[in-house]
Each structure stands twice: as structure tokens, then as C-alpha cells.
């Protein structure tokens, strides 16, 4: 076919003025926007910008058949049916640039740039979030958002199945650059097909998405023999590169921290021309299977550039993304060439021409992924914690992650769905232990990103702002405070002279205060230590507890040091042992000194057993507004170095299951009753009243009655006695009997006496504690 000349036409809707195309140059690449620079002249000068810029346009290249005049003579109106010229090519788009060069008397020279409508998505940068979508779904949703119709304005011809990403971020990049980037990362490329009324975007990922126009172009290297206008490839050059033999990837997925993500893949294992392993960290995949898929895509991208061709010619209507067959296909491309880029040109004084780059058509084209060109978020980005419905407490996942609202995200999301769950970096952590103060809705947080990747945010910490002021400022700059949203607080004051630690919770106002104590207005309310609550308080120590008022200056000394208590307990043991010796001599019942010694030496000393030792050098006071109970399951010891005073306003009861022994070694025993009877009874045995010296039995306002059912005997140390028994009186004396005073002897008479009686049943053994009870 002979193509000596072409007709060029530029059409706008509406058309502002007559145009005559002077020349053009076009650029078309796979996965890029095509660009046609068209220069033209017009008899109209000063065409307004708004009549051209941004308007839909068509650039038409229509070959001229040099034999058309002859065919018209032969066939008339049917001449074009017998012409060999290919159909005209129409490039659709919009005008993105409009220049005016100069004006002469006859015409004005202009230049426009025609690009696809998709170029409008490359004008300004924006930032958006996409969640739980595949790349195909993201691209489809984005293009539809801007008015593109699926199946009409764009089509997907994909073979692979693509996973849904939890989170993909468009950050400070144009929408076109974002689409271009995420497609490249998945190994998806795109091309344009010029239809009758529009340019259609075709997304593909394999050989079957290549455009196949079923034509064969002659390869005619310039030899001066062929006709100068014949459609052909005039030159074809091959370039080969030594590429990596494999791609190795590695990453880390904190959701499966024990799973290794180190993978390596090769798409050409038997190729001896390859060498080295291309290793990258941080492609952001979650499983080894996904990693191997990405590694294979990256190696296929290397292999797609292993063999490349560059050519020149005038093959008409050559497009990036199509397969071109040659009548002499190269040995490395037996199935033809896949065109990756085309540059073309022509005009009034220049025949149509083009240059191209290509790869063998049996190789899968993969866009190159330049990691350095990915958007990067450097430094700290502010964000806010979000939750569904202003959740009162921290809204967390099972793993303890948060949902955040990023400042650049202008989309409306369902409550609590503004981001994927984001991890919180903490100063300390481990297997179910660590440091975590939960954030609630509205908290400002500082966000950083792993490797600067916008898809991998991490919460670094919380920030205060005008809505959430800091709890430490110039007014309390000596205080260190940890306070929760619920009001639980730990405050440490560093101001010299009033240092303190204050731990409190609002519930029942439970507090621990150490050091200098102040109220809410910083007025002093005490010093030392205080543990208080409006509720219950318990103190437990499984190995023993020491409660002591003994001084340890400067906090020095052993934890269980209690020298004063030890001395007092040892003194008590010595006192009781000494009193026992005296009691033994007096034939009184003895105290259980051995048990006391065992208690002191084997249990109380150094808290060898679970005991409580309470010690105070100057005294201990125990007070109760109502009742008090002291109980011991076995033995109770009460010892004092000087005296024991027990005062009860109403009454005292002392009861013993076995016996009571009261012994006074020196001064004596007094039992007095200011009012009421004094009763002493031996209800089950004899009673002995003995004294070393005089014994007085008297009644100041009554009589003394001495009775005994079996008799009464009064005797002295010399042998004289008076015996009353069995209804008779017997008087005896080893010497004389003196009777002073009158003596009346009458007939017999009888007295009537009442004798007490007691139950003969024995007392039951008391099971449990023996108590001293003190009551009102």
C-alpha cells in the first residue's frame, strides 16, 4: 500500500473558527496518557481561550490514496470501495493546552495539546481512603465518581483474581497517578482504544488483553529499492539486558508475627543470561502466598525489559498496547511485537512517520514499580480517635487497636468506620503485659507510618489541644500527673518541702497519700501517710504483717526490724515466767509459759509464721464506739510490766471452762462491791478460805450466818473446839471452859436453815474460742 500523503483535521465541539492543520506530533505509551500536539493556522485571530481550552476534540488522520482520481474515473461514486487506503484514524480527547504563536495579514498560527479525558484526573492532587476493596473495585468506583461508565468508557480484561485490601490510601497525588500506581503494583496495565465516538480505557494483566488488529506490516530496511511511500518498518533494532534471575521479598505481619514472609520467585528459571537476586523489604503483603505472587509480578517486570525493540517506519494507525506482526518476525519475537510506546508525526510538508518501542508479544508486559515514587508521609500526622455513636469508653478491637479519623480524609464514613484498626505504639509491652492507657472518642493522636507508607499508620501517642487541654501547665509545673478519663489519678508533687504522692479513685473516694498532704486548694491537711476510703478496707499479708510506730530514720533498716517489739515480747515472757515461779510456790495454777515462749520465739520474731505484730514505743490505743471482740482459738496472753487496769461502767463477766487462778505475789487481792451482794460459791466441790494472819468475818449492818448441812466446827490451835452437828452442840477444851454472862437453859428448840442445791450434770467442754467479753 502506498501512502504518499495524509489529510489532517482537528475538530472541536462547537468549532470556533476554520482550522488548517500545519503539523502534529503524537506520543502514546502503555499505562500513560497519550498526547497529541497539533499546530494549525486560522484566518481568525485571537480565538478566545474558553472556545478551545477544555473542549472535547477529535484529531483525524485520513490517508490519501494517490490513485483515487483514477478510480473515480473508472468507478465514479463507488471509487472508495476499490481503494486500498486504510480507514481514517480518529483520536478523541479534550484540549488541555492552547497557544497562539503569531499573526500575519492572512492567518494566525496556533497550537493545541489533545489528551484523553482521563487527563483531567491528573490536574490536582487529593487524598482519600479506600477500605476493604480490590484494585479493580477502587478504580471502578473512582472512575464512576468522575462520570465514567463501566463497559462504555472503561473495561477490565483481567485474568487473575485480586484480593481486597484492608486499607489503601491516596495521598497527595492526582487521581490518575493513584490509579496508575495501584494498577502497577498489582501488575495491571492499561491502554486506549479509539472507538467511533470515544476513547475507551482497557485494563489488562495478561497476553489476552493485548490489542490484536490482525495485520502484518512489511519489514523493509532502507535499501533504496522500495517505493518511498510504501507502508513499512524501515528499521528495527534489538536491545537486551542482563536482568535479575529472581526477586526476593520480605515483610512482617504483626497479625501473624510467627509466620515468616520471606519469599523468592523466578519467572525464568532456565535463563542463563540472568544474574543476581533483586531483594526488597516492605511490599506490604500479609501471607507467604501473597508475597510469592507479588515477587513473581516484579520478576515478570524485569523480564519484560530483558529484550526490547525500537523501530522506525510509517505503519499507519500504530497504537501502544497492540500486537504488530511483521512479515519477517525476529527470532526472539516469533509471534510479533507488543508495542509499548509510539511517537508519530506528519504535516503539510512532512509525510506521516512513527517510531516505536516493543517487546516480544509472547511476553507479559508488567509496568515497572518505582518504590521511590510512592507517596511518603514523613514525620507526624495528627488524627482523632473515633467510635460508633460517641462511645463513652475506649472503642477497641480484640487486639487493642483503634479506629482513627485522618485530617485529610474528607469522605463520610459510618461511625467507627473511618479507618482500619490501627496499632498503638507503647513504651513497654509483651505477652499480655505492658503499658496501655485507653484513648476515648475525640482524643487527638500523633500518627507515623511504617517506611512512610500511607497504608501503614501507627499511633505514636496522644496529643493535647485547645479542646483537650493539658493537665500539667505553668500553674502546676512541679506536679507529675497520670489521670484517667474517669478521674482516677496518680499525682506526684516535686516542689521542695511539700513533696508528696497522691493516688485516688472517685469511687468511694479511696486514696493513698504519702508525704505532704494537701486538699483540692493546696492547703495543708497533714503529713506522713494516709490510706482512706468511704468503703471497706482490708489489709492482707499471707506471710505475716508488722504494724509498727518504731522509727527508721531516712527509710533505712530492715523491713521486718522491730527491736522495741522484740524487747517488749521478751520482757513479757520473762515477767510471766517470774510470776509463774511465785505462783508455783503458792501452789497456784501456772500460766502456759512454754506456749508463750513458742509464740514469741518461733512465730512472732521476724514474722516467721503468718502472724500480726503491732508495736508502738509510746503506746497503742484501740477504741470502738460500740463493741469489741478479742478471741484466740487456743491461748491468750496478757502481760504488762507494771499494771493492768480494767474499767467497766456496768459489769464484768469472767468464765473459764476449766479453772480460774488469781494470784498476787506481794500486795494482796481486794474484791469489793460498793453496792449489791458479793457471792463466792463452790458449786461442785469444797471451798477453802485461808490466811497467814488474822481473818475477819463481819457484817456492819446485819448478821453473820454460818451453816453446814453436816455440821459446823470452830476450833483453835490449842485443841479447844465447838462442834454443831446432828442437832447437838459439842463444846470441848483440853483445859477449862469459861462462860461469862447470864446463862439460860430452856427446853429443846430447833432452827430452820435452807441449804443451796446445784445440778449434778457436768459442764460441757467449750468448743472454740475462750473469750474475755467486755460489754456495756
Model-derived regions: residue spans:
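Amphipathic alpha-helical and helix-coil boundary elements used as assembly
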Residues: 1-776
Amino acid at each position: 500500500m502506498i501512502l504518499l500523503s495524509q489529510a489532517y483535521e482537528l475538530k472541536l465541539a462547537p468549532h470556533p473558527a476554520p482550522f488548517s492543520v500545519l503539523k502534529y506530533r503524537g506520543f502514546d505509551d502503555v499505562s500513560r496518557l497519550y498526547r497529541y500536539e497539533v499546530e494549525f493556522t486560522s484566518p481568525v485571530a485571537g480565538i478566545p481561550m474558553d472556545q478551545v481550552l477544555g473542549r472535547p476534540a477529535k484529531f483525524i488522520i485520513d490517508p490519501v490514496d494517490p490513485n483515487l482520481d483514477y478510480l473515480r474515473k473508472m468507478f465514479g461514486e463507488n471509487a472508495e470501495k476499490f481503494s486500498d487506503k486504510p480507514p481514517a484514524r480518529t483520536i478523541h480527547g479534550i484540549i488541555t493546552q492552547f497557544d497562539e504563536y503569531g499573526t500575519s495579514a492572512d492567518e494566525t498560527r496556533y497550537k493545541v495539546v489533545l489528551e484523553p479525558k482521563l487527563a483531567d484526573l491528573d490536574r490536582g492532587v487529593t487524598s482519600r481512603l479506600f477500605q476493604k476493596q480490590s484494585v479493580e473495585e477502587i478504580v471502578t468506583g473512582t472512575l464512576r465518581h468522575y462520570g465514567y461508565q463501566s463497559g462504555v468508557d472503561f473495561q477490565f480484561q483481567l485474568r487473575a483474581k485480586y484480593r481486597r485490601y484492608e486499607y489503601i490510601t491516596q495521598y497527595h497525588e492526582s487521581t490518575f497517578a493513584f490509579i496508575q500506581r495501584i494498577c502497577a503494583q498489582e501488575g495491571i496495565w492499561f491502554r486506549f482504544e479509539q472507538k467511533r465516538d470515544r476513547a475507551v480505557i482497557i485494563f489488562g494483566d495478561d497476553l489476552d488483553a493485548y490489542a490484536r488488529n490482525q495485520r502484518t506490516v512489511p519489514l523493509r530496511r532502507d535499501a533504496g529499492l522500495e517505493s518511498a511511500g510504501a507502508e513499512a518498518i524501515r528499521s528495527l533494532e534489538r536491545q537486551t539486558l542482563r536482568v535479575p534471575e529472581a526477586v526476593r521479598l520480605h515483610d512482617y505481619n504483626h497479625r501473624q508475627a510467627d509466620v515468616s514472609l520471606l519469599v523468592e520467585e523466578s519467572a525464568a528459571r532456565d535463563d542463563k543470561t540472568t544474574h543476581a537476586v533483586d531483594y526488597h523489604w516492605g511490599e506490604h503483603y500479609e501471607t507467604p502466598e501473597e508475597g510469592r505472587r507479588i515477587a513473581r509480578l516484579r520478576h515478570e517486570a524485569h523480564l519484560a525489559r530483558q529484550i526490547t525493540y525500537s523501530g522506525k517506519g510509517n505503519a499507519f494507525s500504530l497504537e501502544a498496547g497492540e500486537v504488530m506482526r511483521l512479515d519477517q518476525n525476529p527470532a526472539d519475537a516469533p509471534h510479533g511485537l507488543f508495542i509499548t510506546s509510539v511517537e508519530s508525526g506528519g504535516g503539510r510538508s512532512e509525510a506521516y512517520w512513527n517510531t516505536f518501542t516493543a517487546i516480544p508479544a509472547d511476553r507479559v508486559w508488567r509496568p515497572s514499580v518505582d518504590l521511590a515514587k510512592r507517596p511518603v508521609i514523613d514525620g507526624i500526622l495528627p488524627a482523632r480517635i473515633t467510635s460508633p455513636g460517641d462511645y463513652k469508653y475506649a472503642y477497641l478491637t480484640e487486639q487493642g487497636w483503634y479506629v482513627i479519623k485522618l485530617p485529610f480524609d474528607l469522605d463520610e464514613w459510618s461511625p467507627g468506620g473511618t479507618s482500619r484498626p490501627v496499632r498503638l505504639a507503647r513504651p513497654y509491652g509483651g505477652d499480655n503485659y505492658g503499658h496501655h492507657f485507653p484513648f476515648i472518642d475525640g482524643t487527638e493522636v500523633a500518627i507515623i507510618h511504617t517506611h512512610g507508607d500511607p497504608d501503614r499508620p501507627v499511633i505514636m501517642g496522644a496529643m493535647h489541644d485547645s479542646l483537650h487541654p493539658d493537665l500539667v501547665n505553668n500553674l502546676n509545673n512541679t506536679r507529675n500527673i497520670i489521670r484517667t478519663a474517669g478521674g482516677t489519678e496518680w499525682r506526684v508533687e516535686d516542689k521542695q518541702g511539700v513533696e508528696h504522692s497522691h493516688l485516688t479513685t472517685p469511687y468511694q473516694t479511696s486514696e493513698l497519700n504519702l508525704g505532704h498532704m494537701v486538699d483540692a486548694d493546696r492547703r495543708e491537711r497533714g503529713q506522713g501517710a494516709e490510706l482512706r476510703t468511704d468503703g471497706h478496707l482490708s489489709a492482707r499479708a499471707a506471710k505475716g504483717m508488722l504494724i509498727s510506730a518504731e522509727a527508721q530514720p531516712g527509710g533505712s533498716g530492715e523491713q521486718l526490724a522491730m527491736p522495741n517489739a522484740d524487747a517488749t515480747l521478751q520482757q513479757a515472757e520473762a515477767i510471766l515466767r517470774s510470776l509463774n515461779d511465785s505462783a508455783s510456790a503458792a501452789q497456784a495454777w501456772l500460766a502456759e509459759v512454754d506456749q508463750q515462749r513458742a509464740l514469741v520465739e518461733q512465730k512472732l520474731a521476724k514474722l516467721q509464721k503468718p502472724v500480726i505484730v503491732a508495736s508502738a514505743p509510746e503506746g497503742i490505743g484501740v477504741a470502738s464506739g460500740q463493741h469489741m471482740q478479742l478471741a484466740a482459738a487456743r491461748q491468750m496472753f496478757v502481760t504488762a510490766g507494771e499494771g493492768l487496769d480494767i474499767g467497766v461502767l456496768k459489769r464484768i463477766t469472767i468464765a473459764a471452762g476449766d479453772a480460774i487462778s488469781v494470784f498476787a505475789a506481794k500486795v494482796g487481792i481486794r474484791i469489793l462491791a460498793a453496792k449489791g451482794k458479793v457471792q463466792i460459791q463452790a458449786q461442785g466441790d469444797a471451798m477453802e478460805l485461808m490466811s497467814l494472819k488474822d481473818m475477819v468475818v463481819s457484817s456492819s449492818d446485819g448478821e453473820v450466818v454460818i451453816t453446814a448441812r453436816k455440821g459446823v466446827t470452830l476450833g483453835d490451835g490449842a485443841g479447844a473446839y465447838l462442834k454443831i452437828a446432828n442437832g447437838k452442840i459439842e463444846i470441848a477444851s483440853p483445859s477449862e471452859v469459861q462462860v461469862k454472862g447470864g446463862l439460860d437453859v430452856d427446853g429443846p428448840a430447833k432452827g430452820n436453815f435452807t441449804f443451796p442445791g446445784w445440778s449434778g450434770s457436768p459442764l460441757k467442754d467449750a468448743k472454740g474460742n475462750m473469750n474475755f467479753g467486755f460489754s456495756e
